[in-house]
A protein has these predicted regions:
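Symmetry-related core transmembrane helices of the 12-TM Major Facilitator Superfamily/SLC fold
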Residues: 167-185, 366-384
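Intracellular juxtamembrane helix-capping segments at the cytosolic ends
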Residues: 35, 116-131, 315-329
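Helix-to-loop junctions at the C-terminal end of transmembrane segments
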Residues: 62-76, 160-161, 261-274, 360
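Hydrophobic core of transmembrane alpha-helices in multi-pass small-molecule transporters
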Residues: 22, 91, 95, 101-119, ...
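Cytoplasmic helix-loop-helix junction between adjacent transmembrane helices
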Residues: 108-144
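Juxtamembrane intracellular "pre-TM" segments in multi-pass secondary transporters
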Residues: 2-11, 183-221
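Helix-loop boundary and gating motifs at the non-cytosolic
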Residues: 7-57, 61, 211-250
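Structural signature of the two symmetry-related core transmembrane helices
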Residues: 79-93, 173, 277-292
Length: 388
């Protein structure tokens, strides 16, 4: 990309999107790893924590698509994003005085409602501002989010060690509120509201598009196959004698590969091979990754397999978002991304996670062969994603 295009990108809001994604995903990184521990410290039993997290997940599945449809209907993605993130920040801070299940139920559900919409709404705004890569690459801002998540996760450990669990919640709440301000500072692209109508019409219009349905299904299969890894990879490695520090480095390598693909490797690769082929590459990379984990715990092989996360997750995300942008009308973009992120990927992750526990309990590492099959199941959908 030439110097003039980069300058136009900064004028078009690249710097503001970088700030938004860094603040938003940094706030997630501060809170996500430690929230169950905080709930336990405030007197919740494991069963109550599971109930709370399950209720929060179910609420997100409802709120996310509705918020996306409302933002499209009212042409208000930017203010809806800002309001959602502000609500999230206040909900995080509202956890601080609570103790016990009933006192923390309200803040937890508010947090779930607030976090349902921001990622797809931010993506919709970033894709519109990027203009298909003519102004800037969407991957640049998403890489900033991933890098901020990693940094914030490390910072959370330092904050907790120095000041206690509550300090990480305060920092997360403040960052969410800062992200709300960053959302309001984005370039104004909100148009006139459409005439009122049933929000479900947005969903119906999108689900009538065959290519969009295939994108949802393919993305669900490849992302859903990550569930066993996310829940049990650390348990597998520690059980095989891999130390906590080494296991952490292996995991960090996978996230570093994600940042690399978002920032540098992904956009030129997709420009060369095409978006549908990108989904095929992601599916094959995922299948190879899970096959290696099914067969061995030899550290160099596991580390090499984990580097495939850049393809199995980041390349898939870039390809799916590019196809959604090419397939869906702009006035339904926030709804489309909310369906992709909240329902297709979120629901598939929940279902695959439920299955993963039983699979790992019955078969141990060999359960990863099921994830290999799940990834490869996306390949027959790829021809239907091409332009006709």
């Amino acid at each position: 990309m030439g110097e003039g295009a980069i300058s136009e990108g900064w004028r078009g809001g690249l710097a503001r999107f970088l700030v938004l994604y860094a603040a938003l995903y940094g706030a997630y990184g501060l809170l996500s790893p430690i929230l169950p521990g905080f709930l336990a410290a405030r007197g919740l039993s494991p069963g109550q924590i599971g109930t709370l997290l399950a209720a929060a997940g179910a609420l997100r599945l409802v709120v996310g698509p509705l918020a996306g449809a409302f933002a499209d209907r009212r042409r208000a993605a930017r203010p809806v994003l800002a309001a959602s993130v502000a609500l999230t920040g206040l909900a995080v801070l509202a956890h601080l005085p609570g103790a016990g299940f009933w006192q923390l139920l309200g803040p937890a559900l508010l947090y779930a409602a607030g976090t349902a919409a921001p990622p797809p709404l931010a993506d919709a705004l970033a894709l519109a501002a990027a203009r298909g890569g003519a102004v800037f690459q969407y991957g640049w801002v998403r890489a900033a989010g991933s890098a901020a998540f990693i940094a914030a996760t490390g910072a959370a450990g330092w904050l907790i060690g120095s000041y206690g669990l509550a300090a990480a919640l305060v920092a997360s709440g403040v960052l969410f509120i800062a992200a709300s301000g960053a959302a309001l500072a984005l370039p104004v692209r909100d148009g006139s509201a459409k005439a009122g109508g049933w929000l479900g019409r947005n969903f119906a219009e999108l689900l009538r598009l065959p290519r969009f349905r295939r994108i949802l299904f393919a993305g669900s299969l490849v992302i859903g196959a990550h569930a066993l890894h996310d829940g049990f990879a650390m348990i597998l490695w520690r059980g095989a004698g891999i130390g906590a520090g080494t296991a952490g480095l292996i995991w960090s390598g996978s996230v570093a590969a994600e940042v690399l693909v978002f920032l540098l490797a992904g956009p030129p690769l997709l420009a060369r091979i095409g978006l549908p082929a990108g989904i095929a590459v992601a599916a094959c990379a995922g299948a190879l990754r899970w096959a290696v984990l099914a067969c061995t715990t030899v550290i160099p092989l596991v580390a090499a397999a984990e580097a495939l996360h850049g393809l199995s997750f980041a390349l898939l995300h870039l390809a799916c978002l590019g196809l959604i942008e090419a397939t869906t009308p702009p006035e339904l973009r926030a709804t489309a991304l909310a369906l992709y992120g909240t329902v297709a990927l979120g629901l598939s992750g929940v279902l695959a996670t439920l299955a993963s526990g039983a699979l790992y309990g019955a078969f141990g590492a060999s359960a990863f062969w099921a994830m290999t099959a799940l990834s490869l199941a996306a390949l027959p959908l790829v021809p239907g994603l091409r332009d006709r």
